[in-house]
Structures are given as C-alpha cells and as structure tokens.
C-alpha cells in the first residue's frame, strides 16, 4: 500500500495501480527524493510550486508534492487504467481542483498550455530509455525553464542522461534505484 509520507495529507493511503506497465517508486526512494529536493544544495521550494509528474503511474510523486504544499500538478500518463487511479487518488485527497491529467505518451508532447514547471518528476519504466525523449519533448513544447529542477528515477545500472540539453546536478542510489537531478544546460 502506498501512503503519503508528509504534509497536510500525511498517512493517507493511495489507491495502487494494478497495471503491469506501472512500477511504483518505493517509499524509501520517494522520501529520499523529497529530502534531496527541499534540503541540501538543491533547496527547492515546494510551497506553491508547479510540478509535472511524467510517467505518473498512480500519481504518488505528484500527490506527495501537493500534500507538501505544491500549488498545482500536471500528471502525464498514457495507461488508461493508471489515469483512472490518478483521478481517483486526486479526488479522494481533495486535490482535483489543483491538478490536470493528460492521457498521452510523455514522449509525444508537442504543445504545452501550462506554465513552465518548477519541478519535474520523470519516472519512466526501468531500462526503457524513455526519460530523455520525454524530457526533450517537454522542453521543445515549452514546459521546462532555466530554473526547473528535474528529478529522474532510473535503475541504478542505467547510464545517466546524455546527449540532451540537461546538466546533472546530483545523483544518489537507493537499492536498485538511482535518483538523478538535472537542470537545463
């Protein structure tokens, strides 16, 4: 069971996504991700921020950010069953008014009708190689700015993003997962 770790909805249980295409971020990794974002050298301000959750799955990362004070979240997920779970989780937690859910392939984004993101969570399926294409698409569509912090979860053995317009800020390992943080170059 996935629970909210902190903030105004701390302890609330999220509906999990049973789709075989969805792999939830572990609680330990999710906690580390938010500790790194809001502490240390990244020093992100979640309060009032605009977050984008790419490959959103159950929406746990975006919902966690909303619980911790983010002002708005956009969830991008192509699996219809996962989209239903995201919608249900946002409604149960009273976040529906603060969210938009796009049922689309994150790598096929061609236009962006929202503000530039403050924080982007990118949790593509492990070993898929989809993180960089999705971030490139969102960047070309106008969703990433110079101050946007991008948090990417990959399998520990996968290489860091390379060949794109992104600069690595920090990288940490948690079990089989790697969390890497980037900004535009």
Which residues are covered by each model-predicted region?
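Class I S-adenosyl-L-methionine-dependent methyltransferase catalytic core
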Residues: 1-185
């Amino acid at each position: 069971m996935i629970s909210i770790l902190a903030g105004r909805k701390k302890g609330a249980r999220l509906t999990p996504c049973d789709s075989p295409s969805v792999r939830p971020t572990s609680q330990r990794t999710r906690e580390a991700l938010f500790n790194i974002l809001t502490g240390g050298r990244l020093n992100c301000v979640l309060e009032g921020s605009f977050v984008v959750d790419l490959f959103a799955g159950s929406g746990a990362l975006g919902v966690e950010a909303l619980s911790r004070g983010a002002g708005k979240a956009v969830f991008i997920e192509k699996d219809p069953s996962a989209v239903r779970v995201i919608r249900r989780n946002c409604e149960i937690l009273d976040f529906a008014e603060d969210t938009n859910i796009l049922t689309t392939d994150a790598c096929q984004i061609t236009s962006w009708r929202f503000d530039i993101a403050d924080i982007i969570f990118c949790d593509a399926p492990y070993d898929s190689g989809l993180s960089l294409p999705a971030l490139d698409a969102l960047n070309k569509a106008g969703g990433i700015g110079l101050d946007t912090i991008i948090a990417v979860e990959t399998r520990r053995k996968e290489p860091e993003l390379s060949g794109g317009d992104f600069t690595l800020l920090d990288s940490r390992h948690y079990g089989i997962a790697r969390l890497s943080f980037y900004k535009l170059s």
